[in-house]
């Protein structure tokens, strides 16, 4: 008996000595089924800012994805994982939020050139979507060659389709060899630059039938900034600020006249929306900070139509070792999945020459330095305020709409250009031909009305300032509960980095952050936490410099710069 006991003690001592020399890892990180696949990282957050902070702490090549719940409020959660792990579970067919998955395009990250295209079929009975896509690819390829000396064809463009009986819808991902853009803001600048003739057609409010013949595209925009593995070289000249406003206005008229013939070649890009108003075939609202872009094989929440390979797609990816064709398509479709190799071109783009010249003139006329405003044609960075503005212009039997928004980050003012609703406080009635603007001051939490009408503008008229509803003021939007717990019908559910994605079908619908595991974030000051919240809500950071003048509003000259892109009428009301 004693001998057996001594043998056991000896074995235990030998094991203890072995594990002292070869200790177990402190954290066990299981891998996927294939040896070459990375260690698993799978963590879900309720807030986008928290997800990006977690990414910075990871050694693995992880990315942020948005998961949309199948609810009417469009609530989203944010998943941090690798491309390989996401694809591994993406194709398992689990009934989870992976069915409605979006790639989050981080600000300032290099990315591919991409497009979101759509039109309603009933409102555009003569539109040939496939032909329009082919013409757009031809146009963009020509501009890439003209401005950057980049060769591209339809065989370098991944064409994804999610069309329905009601709507034609495509995503295009351009994949020219060893070519990426500096970030998606520069992508947006490039797209707006090459589509200026079409944008002017929309602004002119002139019916433009869809062209059936080929389009002869001629460059009319300034050469953008190009970065080729080195510092940026600005190739765009800025006009002398000493020139006067009338001269620039006359020059604009001459330019519009000279390009009238060219504009007609871009008419294939003009479509009707549901209300019959003109809009672009290309959605210009998808080039914003931290944009959520729907992924290949995903559908919108509440919808069953997924993004699939289009019938007229000509792109075929190169399959690397241990990568299937389907996975290769998936990896090619990811906007931020870019590689930096020797000879990679990093493209950048400024605004069109016309806008840069006008900005230079305005800076000479105002004693301040203003950032270029953000702009868009659909949702602004503040959807709650968008809804409030729509409530102001949809009343008394009049159906108004938001034609365009502009965000002045330095002043924190949103300018909404209104269509279909022309009531003006200055004259006490609706203008006959000139549209109005609704301005929202986010700092003062008030709104007021101004006009495109020359008489009102000459008087520098603005209506009385009225307070915003408390529910949409930023001070209330930034207030969040300390615990972001979403309660299951039965009990609270935690999702940590060790949760099994296969169980997401039961837990992802009611997710919660395990705040005890993220104490490093909890220890941050309230002010820092509030700043991170603001960054998650806003699409543009507030200017970090002080203004050199005292004023309560944006000068009309600055508003005029933006209104030139829109439908303005110079006739006085009688």
Curated annotation (Swiss-Prot):
Subcellular location per the Swiss-Prot or TrEMBL entry: Nucleus; Mitochondrion matrix; Chromosome
Top EC category: transferase
Cofactor note: Can act both with Mn(2+) and Mg(2+) as cofactor in vitro, but Mn(2+) is the preferred cofactor in vivo.
Main localization category: nucleus
Top-level taxon of the source organism: Eukaryota
Coiled coil: 2-22
Pfam families assigned: Herpes_UL52
Name of protein: DNA-directed primase/polymerase protein
């Amino acid at each position: 008996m004693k001998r057996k006991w001594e043998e056991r003690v000896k074995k235990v001592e030998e094991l203890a000595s072995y594990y002292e020399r070869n200790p177990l890892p402190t954290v066990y990180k299981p891998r996927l089924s294939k040896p070459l696949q990375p260690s698993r990282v799978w963590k879900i957050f309720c807030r986008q800012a928290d997800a990006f902070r977690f990414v910075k702490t990871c050694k693995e090549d992880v990315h942020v994805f948005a998961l949309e719940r199948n609810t009417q409020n469009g609530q989203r959660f944010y998943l941090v994982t690798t491309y390989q792990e996401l694809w591994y579970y993406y194709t398992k067919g689990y009934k989870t939020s992976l069915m409605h998955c979006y790639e989050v395009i981080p600000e300032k990250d290099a990315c591919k050139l991409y497009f979101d295209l759509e039109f309603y079929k009933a409102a555009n009975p003569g539109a040939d979507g496939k032909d329009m896509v082919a013409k757009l690819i031809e146009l963009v390829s020509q501009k890439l060659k003209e401005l950057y000396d980049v060769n591209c064809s339809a065989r370098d463009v991944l064409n994804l389709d999610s069309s329905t009986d009601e709507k034609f819808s495509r995503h295009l991902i351009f994949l020219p060899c060893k070519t990426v853009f500096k970030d998606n803001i520069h992508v947006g600048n490039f797209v707006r630059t090459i589509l200026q003739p079409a944008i002017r057609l929309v602004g002119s409010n002139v019916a433009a039938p869809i062209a059936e013949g080929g389009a002869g595209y001629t460059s009319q925009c300034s050469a953008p900034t190009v970065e080729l593995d080195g510092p940026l070289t600005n190739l765009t000249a800025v006009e002398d600020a000493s020139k006067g406003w009338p001269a620039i206005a006359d020059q604009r008229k001459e330019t519009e006249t000279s390009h009238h013939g060219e504009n007609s070649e871009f008419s294939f890009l003009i479509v009707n929306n549901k209300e019959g108003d003109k809009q672009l075939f290309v959605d210009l609202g998808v080039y914003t900070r931290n944009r959520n872009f729907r992924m290949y094989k995903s559908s919108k929440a509440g919808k069953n139509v997924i993004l699939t390979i289009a019938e007229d797609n000509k792109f075929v990816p190169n399959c690397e070792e241990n990568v299937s064709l389907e996975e290769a398509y998936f990896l090619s479709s990811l906007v931020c999945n870019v590689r930096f190799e020797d000879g990679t071109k990093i493209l950048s783009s400024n605004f069109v020459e016309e806008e840069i010249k006008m900005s230079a003139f305005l800076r000479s006329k105002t004693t301040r330095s203003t950032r270029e405003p953000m702009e868009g044609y659909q949702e602004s960075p503040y959807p709650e305020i968008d809804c409030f503005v729509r409530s102001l212009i949809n009343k008394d039997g009049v159906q108004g709409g938001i034609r365009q928004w502009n965000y002045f980050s330095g002043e924190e003012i949103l300018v909404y250009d209104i269509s279909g609703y022309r009531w003006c406080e200055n004259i006490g009635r609706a203008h006959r031909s000139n549209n109005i603007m609704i301005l929202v001051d986010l700092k003062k939490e008030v709104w007021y009305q101004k006009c495109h009408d020359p008489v009102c503008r000459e008087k520098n008229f603005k209506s009385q300032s009225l307070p915003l509803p408390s529910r949409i003021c930023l001070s209330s939007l930034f207030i969040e509960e300390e615990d972001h717990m979403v309660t299951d019908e039965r009990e609270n559910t935690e999702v940590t980095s060790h949760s099994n994605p296969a169980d997401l079908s039961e837990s992802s619908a009611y997710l919660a952050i395990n705040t005890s595991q993220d104490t490093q974030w909890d220890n941050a000051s309230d002010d820092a936490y509030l700043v991170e919240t603001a960054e998650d809500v806003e699409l543009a950071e507030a200017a970090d410099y002080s203004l050199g003048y005292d004023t309560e509003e944006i000068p009309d000259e600055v508003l005029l710069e933006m209104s030139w892109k829109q439908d303005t009428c110079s006739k006085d009301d009688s």
